[in-house]
């Protein structure tokens, strides 16, 4: 089948190269569309810009998810499964293609850890770059032009037919999934599966951060999301404590307290992290702050102070033993032996011929004076500072 068709869209022309099968799919919001594509210029050579088959990885987009190149959703929803079609698109539809292409190329080269899909995250920031890092894309960005897209529709999945990633969810769906992820994280934490629990908390935080970008900072809805984010972040930090990643805990809790200095749990969690890395003064200061803000936590604070005292005593004893061992090793080390003397050359054989004129003797350097003092001892090593030791 080879027919030229005009879609009911300005600046788009469709030519079917190979007919599809079945009826037109039901492209509802949330449907996943999987396809191969080839992008070409409209010059005589039909210069290829991108081809998904070259990386052996189909493209996929989610219908209704604000894809970067909006015209592609229009093109795909006009196709049947296994159909191959060529679309000519005018400049009004192709202006952002260089930005999309840059993302796709970087992903194909392994520079992006996600799969080969693209959605509208940080699109506006992309315009701040003076160069896209590819000469052909820089040229397209400077002088937008019509492009040809050859698309083969491979598969259409309903929203219920695949596991949707959180970035694919609508705002309403993200708000609904956050408490589910939160509860699952708590369940996994109680089972001691801290790595899995931390992943659930992280996923929920990402959902909330995405929603928060759409609100005006410090207004009611933004603050509501911020409170939820802080709660999940502190749960995440408790997973990190279990995994002995103390410095990351210090980073997250300090960031929370910079913006919200009244959160008691943040001081408490940070105090525990300080104690684990022998920051005694900082741990005590945070525990004191906990008591000031929440006197009812006196019992828990006393317990942490006892643990801190025991930890510091163990550390001091460990360092005392280390220093004593170094001193004893230095005292028992034998003095260095003097260097061996070089072997003397054998006497020259007597000649029976007429005596030759003796060669001129080179001037000899004076011998080095021997030191009469005792051998030097190696310098003693400095003990590790308790505040910077990495031992746990």
Swiss-Prot record:
Name of the featured protein: Aryl-hydrocarbon-interacting protein-like 1
Gene Ontology MF terms: peptidyl-prolyl cis-trans isomerase activity
Cellular compartments per GO CC: cytoplasm; nucleus
Pro residues biased stretches: 335-346, 355-366
Native species: Macaca mulatta
Function: May be important in protein trafficking and/or protein folding and stabilization.
Keyword line: Cytoplasm, Nucleus, Repeat, TPR repeat
Record domain PPIase FKBP-type: where: 53-145
Subunit description: Interacts with NUB1.
Highest rank taxon of the organism: Eukaryota
Sequence ranges of the TPR repeats: 178-211, 230-263, 264-297
Region Disordered, residue ranges: 329-392
